[in-house]
Regions:
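Acidic, low-complexity/disordered tracts enriched in E/D and polar residues
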Residues: 1-43
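Long, charge-rich, low-complexity alpha-helical segments
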Residues: 30-86
Length: 86
């Protein structure tokens, strides 16, 4: 998947945060804090084409149902789309 905005992932005070850089600073509403699953999905984005690929990776890494994985991925990607990140 293509990440549209310039964001750098940083660890700050124990939290993983996406920090806007470049022109994105002016277009952004601030920092984006990611939970553990958000970090996992974010790291996958450059290497996957579909939502299904992300779900399959989650099922291999975490003990969750397929339904829960699909729901979590859909919510995360929808949020990124709303923010015009992907």
């Amino acid at each position: 998947m293509i990440i549209k905005k310039e964001l750098i992932k940083r660890e700050i005070a124990g939290d993983t945060i996406l920090v806007p850089v470049g022109k994105t600073v002016y277009d952004s509403n601030g920092l984006f804090v990611l939970n553990e699953l958000g970090v996992f999905i974010w790291d996958l984005l450059p290497n996957v084409e579909t939502q299904e690929e992300i779900c399959q990776a989650i099922l291999k890494e975490y003990e969750v149902s397929e339904e829960e994985a699909k729901k979590d991925v859909a919510e995360f990607l929808n949020k990124l789309r709303q923010l015009n990140v992907i």
